[in-house]
Amino acid sequence: LSRGLGDVYKRQKYNDREGIVIDTRFNGGGRLHEDIEILFSGKKYFTQVVRGREACDMPSRRWNKPSIMLQCEANYSNAHGTPWVYSHQKLGKLVGMPVPGTMTSVSWETLQDPSLVFGIPIIGYQLPDGSYLENTQLEPDIKVANAPETVVQGEDTQLKVAVDELLKEIDGK
């Protein structure tokens, strides 16, 4: 998201839709928590009207409609931190399976053989109460497992539940 969040929002393929599903499943991390928080924390404060026709809602460079986030047990590192921030900032519901508490940042080290690279955890994320996010499992608001027998048939139960829940929220507004 280094090009700026306004640019990211403008390039978002379906930014004219009524809701969005954010899928973090099977993500290995990468410091997205702040960008996701900023992009999805928009609260509508007015609508631009041009000669009697609605042009766009403000803020116009951040998502200001309902959203929901998918997570799973394979999320790692910042893919634990991103849904944690999303949930604790009350941006929307989490759907999927619990995420192990793996939120840290690492220093990447290359050995003499440059094909050997590994990360050493050096940064922890401390909460206001003094505890650390690491080793704190993140529970979803709606716990849903994808069963192997449905996955091999091309069904994504977690995504279906997330879409159904998002549609309920949209219809309730």
Please name every model-derived segment.
Residues Q12-D16, E37, S41-Y45, S87-L91, ...:
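Sec-exported extracytoplasmic/periplasmic mature domains
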Residues E18-G28:
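Short, glycine-/small-residue-enriched flexible loop/hinge segments at domain edges that mediate gating
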Residues K10, R31, D35, S77, ...:
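Extracytoplasmic/secreted proteins, especially bacterial periplasmic and envelope-associated proteins
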Residues D16-I20, N64-S67, Q89-K93:
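Loop/turn elements at helix/coil->beta-strand transitions in domains of secreted/extracellular proteins
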Residues I22, S67, Y86, G130, ...:
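Terminal peptide-recognition signature
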Residues L1-Y9:
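Single conserved hydrophobic/aromatic residue that forms the stacking wall/gate
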Residues L91-V151:
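C-terminal structured "cap/appendage" subdomains that terminate the fold
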Residues D7, Y14, N27-A74, M103-S115, ...:
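Gly/Ser/Thr-rich loop/hinge elements
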